[in-house]
A protein has these predicted regions:
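Soluble "head" domains of membrane/secretory-pathway proteins
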Residues: 2-16, 20, 35, 41, ...
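A short acidic/basic microdomain associated with nuclease active sites
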Residues: 44
Length: 204
């Protein structure tokens, strides 16, 4: 009887240890996913040729809270009028003015007064944005009836597949009411894509 009680006590002690371990693992994983990094699956072909449908990616969340996003960063966010996460690339930053011209993106200084009538001399203040991540036939053209933008706050983001139109260029597929509809506010950002796990391991 004594031996049975010892075995029974040992069994329940092991069960308790296992439960404690599982609870600890659960909270560690939850903390990591909420505050450090979380996995996502790419569901669209809009970031081709750099990301494809069913790619597994890891999104780092620390930059969103403590760091700074840079031009060219690939981010995951929830669009202001959508519920599912998007993956897109930051093209320009707060308080920048940009121009779409000749299938290119130009970053221009703020001292150009009239964006609707850009003169030849004004091009001295504009710089063509190099985009080595794009295929030649996916270069940018102005769509949705607008060729110039002033980003007051938030981030202007675009697909790498520029033939898709549900990005900042077209207010994520809804009607554009003012400049705020074109950008992603800070509080909608989830994080920066750091790693692709599948089908090929790639760091960004």
């Amino acid at each position: 009887m004594s031996s049975f009680r010892k075995k029974n006590a040992k069994f329940w002690a092991e069960v308790f240890d296992l439960l404690v371990f599982l609870i600890l693992v659960f909270w560690i994983v939850l903390f990591i996913r909420l505050f450090i990094a979380t996995p996502y699956t790419v569901i669209w072909s809009s970031m081709a040729p750099n990301f494809h449908q069913k790619d597994w990616i890891i999104v780092e969340k620390i930059t969103q809270r403590f760091g700074t996003f840079e031009r060219g960063d690939v981010i995951v966010f929830v669009a202001p009028w959508k519920t599912s996460p998007y993956i897109k690339r930051i093209i320009w930053l707060p308080w920048e003015t940009v121009l779409f011209q000749d299938w290119g993106v130009y970053i221009c200084s703020d001292n150009i007064p009239a964006w609707s009538l850009i003169k030849d001399s004004d091009w001295n203040n504009c710089e063509l944005l190099p985009e080595p991540y794009l295929l030649e036939w996916l270069k940018t053209n102005a769509v949705c009836g607008k060729e110039e933008f002033k980003v007051k706050s938030g981030y202007f983001v675009m697909w790498d597949n520029r033939w898709r139109t549900t990005d900042s260029l077209c207010c994520f597929g809804i009607q554009c009411y003012d400049w705020a509809n074109y950008v992603v506010p800070d509080n909608y950002l989830i994080g920066k894509v750091r790693v692709r796990l599948y089908p090929t391991y790639t760091k960004f």
